[in-house]
Amino acid sequence: MSGLSTVPDNINFAREEDKVAQKWQDENTFQRSVELSKDRPHFTFYDGPPFATGLPHYGHMLTSTIKDVVGRWAHQNGHYVERRFGWDTHGLPVEYEIDKTLGISGPQDVMKMGIANYNNECRKIVMRYSGEWEKTMGRLGRWVDFKHDYKTLYPWFMESVWWAFSELHKKGLVYKGVKVMPFSTACSTPLSNFEAGQNYKDVVDPAVFVGFKLLDCPNRQLVAWTTTPWTLPSNLALVVHPDMLYVVTKDKTTGIEYVVLEERLGELKNDNLEVIEKLAGSQLKDLRYEPLFPYFAYMREERNAFRVLNDTFVTSDSGTGVVHQAPYFGEIDFQVCVANGVIAKDQKMICPVDESGKYTSEVPDYQGVYVKDADKLIIKRLKEMGNLVRQAEVKHSYPFCWRSDTPLLYKAVPSWFINVETLIPRLLANNDETYWVPAFVKEKRFANWLRDARDWAVSRNRFWGTPINLWVSEDGEEVVCVGSIAELEELSGQKITDLHRESVDDVTIPSRSGRGVLKRVSEVFDCWFESGSMPYAQNHYPFENRKIFEDNFPADFIAEGIDQTRGWFYTLLVLSTALFNKPPFKNLICNGLVLASDGAKMSKSKKNYPDPMLIVNKYGADALRLYLINSPVVRGENLRFREEGVRDLLKDVFLPWFNAYRFFVQNVQAYEHETGNVFDMNVHVASENVMDRWIESFTNSLVAFVRKEMDSYRLYAVVGPLTKFFDTLTNIYIRLNRKRVKGDNGLHEQHHALAALGRVLILIVRLMAPFTPFFCEYIWLNLKKVIGSTEESVHFLMLPKPDESLIDETVERRVEVMRNVIDLVRLVRDREGLAVKYPLKEMIVINRDSQFLEDVKSLESYILLELNVRKLTVSQDKQKYGITLKAEPNFKILGARLKGEQKKVADYLKNQITESELEKFLLEGKLTVLGHELSSEEVAVSYAAGSDQGHGYKTHSDAKTIVMIDTTEDESLIEEGLCREVTNRVQRLRKQAKLVSTDTAHVHIVVSPADSQLAKVVAAKLNDIVSATGTPIKLGSPPAAAKAPTATSKSAIKDSEVELWLFAEGDSFDGITVVDGSKKVRVHVKTEKEHLKGYADLLYHVRSALDLWNGKIALKNVDGSAVHPTVDVTSLVGQTLQLVR
């Protein structure tokens, strides 16, 4: 025999996955697959490094699934794919955790503790959750190498980062400057623009209208508007637009004069004002005003500060048209003030705010106060001084620190920069050379970000990171950028074993120009610089692996979330362009975000999403994988995560797939039992059966489609057809060929049907392996026996190629036509409450296309059988059957476009349009009504049956096809329907008893009332029911002395009640019986394949047998006591339990 193992009645997908995962681990399956492929062409993949300071979430699982699918696909498509995990280990995420734990409030606390001690604390936690990551990724089915990972803290990785920076320095792309930057006061460090763009929030801030008194006219005030009162102590200038019109207004009560932009006068909310003068902004230039605060009054003499400037950045859509300038707290302020000589780039900064966001001694009145807390104090003082014109609040979007979730300040910081702005043309050109899915993210979001790129501040005033490799003389004139450990050892004369701050801060380099010694600058690199360096740093390039890197750069593929357009994607491209003038990758999949079911961001504190591992343990990783990548999220859109979506995939995809596989194995075993011969699927004699030819053609066409789309990385296009395949397989092929597969049409036909089904199952298992690796492995380990394969894993196989000789577009078209007709007739049956078990006299199919009707007739026997109809008629003439066309206007779309004309157009469509106009519209897709050209989006066409069709015909249609069914009844049709109902009850009882086709049993049946039509039909048609079910049936209840039945049921059919008792032959049942009303379920505690592990497993089998997937269930003993969840299920053998819902 073929040696196929018996497939159990039910499956716990998660448990079977655990077994497969254990097998992979025990047999080193992933490592062996890599070893087997080492001589193949390389497919290079870069893995964006996560931080191990947090647990993996759905976003990580999504990107990991995408990476795994593409990696497996490339591997099984003939490539060697190094899948190496990497870790981000430096930077704010780590330091922020340590600061919270140790109560560190600023750099001074770190210096007291000592950098070595501080960094040692950081080193302890960087891999806190690495074990959980490895376990989760393994359980998700992601094949990735953790053993040979890379970490940004490895000295060899850091050395490559130094090399990269030294190359940029040689190219003249590194400079030191003062720049107003987003600053995290919680983390005491500046952030780059792309970091600041990651976490905007809507906040309410004070909005104050402040009067600045003119020196020459103290009664006249220029009114500026600001949402940052805390910056007012640092004010040095005001700006107005030179070409806009300003008004001088006078308060009729106080006599105070206010100057504002004419368009913004209403913002003062003062009805007591009169306009006394109008001035162009240029006329206000160089007017001098009194400083609000005395702290920097000396700047009037030093730099001619506290005067009015002109600039065109001033707008009329907000504020007052007068903009207050605190140049060290605003990027535009800084540029304007430098351009007008109010400040100089190289002067001492007027920035009286420290790294914690608190005022320094330069503002003694508020020294030590956090600036946001000082807003109220400053507003109070302005009021007391008579400078507060109006106080309000404004809701606006404001950036927060991506790590600490605290508001950022914009303040001037001396930093080391990479001159990105000079690279913009090359960045855009290199971006054009890459291929993105979806394309719009590359062409719009990312390209726009590149066009507006700013110089990158790569230095951070922190401790745990790769130190910036610059050694500078005390006067700043001599700078050495060290590019390697060896170079530092040579220049310093010291042995270097590590590159962290505690190891290199005290290393000095003698000056070559007599300037004493050079000391390292104190800053470390932005951790994004490190992750952006990973393509070469993970290989310790250029110190090692030079050929490996250069031969395989750029990467073939990367994938991360859409938020990385301003993160990793950006830094990869900047550094690759600057260093190699190449894009860093060829192909990219950019996924959207995974949100909670209500559309909110997933939050641990809100508990608004289910734990990922609970989902995996409940439904299996394959179901979660398929759910995530069969959604808009792989097209760059957002996904609202719903547990029901994962559950539905299990029900709609995996269970039909399992049942098809089980059906195949059962019938191969039955075939071998019947013939005594081994089933040989390799003996391929072309089948003449149209359904065999169709399913093989359909599957090979699917293979061709999937391969083509995967070549273009369009996962979103392939997963839908793959998941729908199983509905096609089970509800078309198996449903219409069940009797052939079971051998009812003879052994020759059975072999053809089994061979076709087997070939299709193996083909789809190989095709789906990268997407659902666990279940494909589970099936392969059994199915490989029928083809005599010795391959130990489906993942060692190459992906299938379509067999073009089996693709028959004609037969695929015909079956698609058949499906269309079947679906339309089913809709009529459902609408009219006509179960398929009850036969109908006639169905009529109307379509103008003769080819369509020919296709219908070619599969007439299947259509009639499936729909349980006696006669099929086709026609091109709808008038013959009283069918007319009817226009259905889309009022929403028409109303939006036609406005007042909509009513006339709709009236014409409803009451005046002719049949010929609608016929023409169906052909051409456009229609002119009252001078308006309408599209098929705006008008739909449906079919209507005339009033003369009331003689029993019911209709339904789509855009091109009409079906009509004769619903009139006669006795023979009713009797046949009743007979089918009973047959169905017996078959369901066999299933409930978990019998396979080779198991023998007999049934007793009682129909009440005894004189009902159903009782007479059962008596008359008993032999037909026995033949259809393969089960002997006896009229009457079982004798009193009979043993307990294997299964029982009681149900209603029409106006009768049917009670059935099934007795399995040779039954020595060692299981548990569960009763649910009139139904019984028997669960084996131990079978050849598995044994029941506990109470939860018992409930799973009960749910599966009774199709009870919703709601809670429990079990109770015959005495009414509850069965405890911790019970040893073996103690329940032989007992009958009651189901409780």
UniProtKB/Swiss-Prot annotation:
It catalyses: tRNA(Ile) + L-isoleucine + ATP = L-isoleucyl-tRNA(Ile) + AMP + diphosphate. The keyword Oxidoreductase does not apply. InterPro entries: aa-tRNA-synth_I_CS (IPR001412), aa-tRNA-synth_Ia (IPR002300), Anticodon_Ile_ABEc (IPR033709), Ile-tRNA-ligase (IPR002301), Ile-tRNA-ligase_type2 (IPR023586), M/V/L/I-tRNA-synth_anticd-bd (IPR013155), Rossmann-like_a/b/a_fold (IPR014729), tRNAsynth_Ia_anticodon-bd (IPR009080). It is an enzyme of class 6 (ligase). Transmembrane segments: none annotated. One of its GO terms (molecular function) is tRNA binding. GO terms for cellular component: cytoplasm. Its main location: cytoplasm. A motif ('HIGH' region) lies at residues 50-60. Belongs to the class-I aminoacyl-tRNA synthetase family. This is Isoleucine--tRNA ligase, cytoplasmic. The gene is iars-1.
